[in-house]
């Protein structure tokens, strides 16, 4: 059993992009920004607990931070982890919270 407090910290935010929106419409997949040290089992358990849905599978990607220029100096954005969570048929997560 995974620590409940840890599960609440695993999922940081939904990741919104063209690719994520297309994946949600076509493949019933939701994309999240997650902790870098989170594993697939933790991500699955966290999504099932937080959003009360059934998860079919989880795929993860380590995203490298981009190098950005600020005038003559260079800076770097942080590396982060992205999780593609495939929901079972008939399951849905509504981030907009629409009523009615």
UniProtKB/Swiss-Prot annotation:
Gene3D superfamilies: 3.30.70.330
Superkingdom of origin organism: Bacteria
An annotated Gene Ontology molecular function: rRNA binding
SUPFAM superfamilies with a match to the protein in the record: Ribosomal proteins S24e, L23 and L15e (SSF54189)
Gene Ontology BP terms: translation
GO cellular component: ribonucleoprotein complex; ribosome
Keyword terms: Ribonucleoprotein, Ribosomal protein, RNA-binding, rRNA-binding
Known role: One of the early assembly proteins it binds 23S rRNA. One of the proteins that surrounds the polypeptide exit tunnel on the outside of the ribosome. Forms the main docking site for trigger factor binding to the ribosome.
Family assignment from sequence similarity: Belongs to the universal ribosomal protein uL23 family.
Protein name: Large ribosomal subunit protein uL23
Gene: rplW
């Amino acid at each position: 059993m995974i620590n409940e407090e840890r599960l609440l910290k695993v999922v940081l935010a939904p990741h919104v992009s063209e690719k994520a929106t297309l994946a949600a419409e076509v493949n019933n997949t939701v994309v999240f920004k997650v902790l870098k040290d989170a594993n697939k089992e933790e991500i699955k358990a966290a999504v099932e607990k937080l959003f009360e849905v059934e998860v079919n599978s989880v795929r993860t990607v380590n995203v490298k931070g981009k190098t950005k220029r600020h005038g003559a100096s260079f800076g770097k954005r942080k590396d982060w982890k992205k999780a593609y969570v495939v929901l079972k048929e008939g399951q849905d997560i509504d981030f907009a919270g629409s009523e009615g």
